[in-house]
Amino acid sequence: MSTSGCKHLQLVQEVRPIADGCQECLTIGDSWVHLRLCLISGDVGCCDASKNKHATKHFHSTKHPIIRSFELGEDWRWCYIDSTFV
């Protein structure tokens, strides 16, 4: 994965996931398709294939740009601002 051009990687922190599932979906009793982990705050949210799209909503409310997959066997990161894998 190319990291060239993404200046937002410097914001990444060593985080602990705040929850084992999408925090917002757990609160409202809903389900999700896949999980994403915010690499700035540790927030766990559901993906855009999930009806609630909580990971993207977290980005819009906090401006935390870098997430990674929170699924077993997946090892990728995404920058919302640059719209690219990093």
Please place each PLM-identified region on the residue numbering.
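Cys/His-rich, Zn2+-coordinating zinc-finger modules
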Residues: T3-Q10, R16-Q23, I28, V44-V86
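Canonical RING-type zinc finger of E3 ubiquitin-protein ligases
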Residues: D30-L39
